[in-house]
Design a protein with these regions (language model features):
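Surface-exposed binding/hinge segments that line
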Residues: 73, 81, 114-157
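Aromatic- and charge-enriched surface segment that lines or borders ligand/interaction sites
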Residues: 69-112, 128, 134, 205-208, ...
């Protein structure tokens, strides 16, 4: 780390932040601050600071009231009632007309919102009075309220061009979005300024923290950098078990990976505990499913696949590869940490007779290849999963791209039937059991090899108080964070 520090010192400016601003360092600029278009993780995290949603989520990923409460009148009709204190940043009340305009905009095919598909079950949305909204569904959906995480815009803004909005319904208002990607926000309750600063290089972000040019850096720091920062005076590291799910995806349309025994051999060849300990510095938890154990539909009896190289070799032999080494290509991003992970996987698979060829690609090419099915194996993560509809999106046979996210072309009639049954079940306890069955089926079939959930981390300067992190890595704590004097520190 010392060499990295010396090499990067010239990149750190001497500029000090304004005393009235709290500065958050992020690795990439948001693509949009418009809730109709905020589909990448950074855009979504910042957009929700500016645009409040009808529905929020508790720690078990259950829907709870946000801007509104609701009732289900029948299987395809939900009525939402807005809170009386909901206001835009100009002081106007948030009304049913604003909600209707926001949802109709996203549902309009001409807008080309990336969020439209997630709301495809809405047949109609109508204002009953100034605070009441009715949603009519195409099909019954007992989990429908959980799909309404879209930030609400003022009606005039919702009808306007992308990112041209003026009024915020969330805890912050927008001061400026600069050409370099930096964002200036003002907290509505007390006027505190928050500067969101793009610093692409992780080492430079760390150095800016030390220099006092940043106050908070959340996530996207290598484990060794976090360990080093934890030893620095004037800084502290906070952590929270995360829900970012990492996995290996397979192309099941042709080749040796169509054989479940080969996929199972790969799963048993991976020493998850060793990778979590040595590479992640214990800042991850081994996974058995997409959804963490804290999720309300997580199957309680799932077990992380065992590290068992003897069994892996036996499975490969049974699949016809006992006398020859199987060669497979693994696509990943060119990020240095992901390449180190790929090398560890390569070494572990080599021990059971699998030769893993690493194909590192820039992010755009890599993600494009995965979406187009141009891979044998790839490594990716799901960020912030809350809804069990991920099972349809990722594993139903009708969800192959471009209709969905079944990128590996997994096709099992039993899984399809379980997904459809779970979606149509209206009784919560029976629905939960159906999702448990889906998770067990996927752990057996292994269209994905589950790896781990990465821990959420943040590094704070000592004078920053009131900042906590949650499981999905949101920036929501900016609504309560504040700077304290030396006498107030604890």
């Amino acid at each position: 780390m010392g060499a990295l520090v010396l090499g990067a010192l010239s990149l750190v400016s001497c500029e000090r932040p304004p005393v009235d601003a709290i500065r958050l360092g992020i690795p990439t600029a948001p693509l949009s601050l418009d809730p109709r278009y905020a589909s990448d993780a950074m855009s979504a995290r910042l957009s929700r600071l500016l645009h409040a949603a009808l529905v929020e989520f508790d720690a078990a990923a259950q829907a709870v009231p946000g801007l509104a409460d609701w009732r289900m009148d029948n299987a395809t009709h939900y009525r939402f009632t807005l809170r009386g204190d909901a206001r835009f940043s100009d002081g106007r009340a948030v009304t049913a007309a604003d909600v209707v305009a926001t949802y109709r905009a996203v549902l309009d095919p001409g807008l080309a919102s990336p969020l439209r598909e997630a709301l495809r079950n809405i047949a109609a949305v109508q204002a009953v009075d100034t605070r009441t909204i009715d949603f009519e569904l195409r099909q019954p959906d007992a989990l429908f309220p959980a799909t309404l995480g879209l930030g609400v815009m003022a009606a005039g803004d919702a009808r306007g061009p992308r990112d041209s909005w003026q009024w915020a319904s969330g805890p912050f208002s927008r001061v400026a979005w600069h050409s370099d990607g930096n964002v200036s926000l003002r907290r509505r309750v007390d006027g505190v300024r928050v500067e969101v600063v793009v610093v692409k290089d992780a080492t430079v972000r760390a150095l800016k923290l030390i220099a006092g040019e940043l106050d908070v850096v959340q996530g996207n720091l290598p484990p060794e950098t976090l360990t080093w920062l934890a030893t620095r005076p004037g800084l502290r590291v906070v952590e929270h078990d995360g829900t970012t799910f990492s996995y290996l995806g397979f192309n099941l349309s042709h080749g040796p990976l169509t054989d479940r025994r080969v996929r199972a051999a790969i799963s048993h060849a991976i020493d998850r505990a060793a990778i979590v300990h040595y590479l992640f510095r214990s800042r991850a938890q081994a996974a058995a499913s997409l959804l963490p154990p804290s999720h309300w539909v997580a199957a309680p009896d799932l077990r992380v696949p065992a590290y068992d190289p003897v069994r892996a070799r036996a499975l490969l032999a049974a699949a016809g590869y006992g006398g020859q080494r199987l060669r497979l290509h693994y696509k990943t991003s060119a990020d240095a940490f992901r390449l180190r992970l790929a090398t560890l996987l390569q070494n572990q698979l080599a021990e059971v007779g699998l030769d893993l060829v690493i194909d590192p690609l820039d992010w755009g090419t890599f993600y494009g290849d995965v979406g187009a099915g141009r891979f044998e194996i790839y490594g990716l993560s799901w960020v912030g999963l809350k809804l069990p509809d991920i099972f349809r999106q990722a594993f139903h046979s009708a969800a192959r791209p471009p209709a969905g996210l079944n990128r590996g072309y997994y096709h099992e009639a039993e899984t399809d039937a379980l997904i459809e049954a779970a979606e149509s079940e209206q009784e919560s306890s029976r629905q939960r059991l159906l999702y448990h069955a889906i998770e067990r089926r996927l752990l057996y079939d292994l269209p994905y090899v589950p790896l781990w959930f990465e821990t959420q981390t943040a590094v704070l300067r000592a004078d920053i108080n009131g900042y906590s992190i949650d499981a999905d890595g949101s920036f929501d704590a900016l609504a309560t964070v504040h700077r304290v004097s030396p006498d107030e520190r604890h």
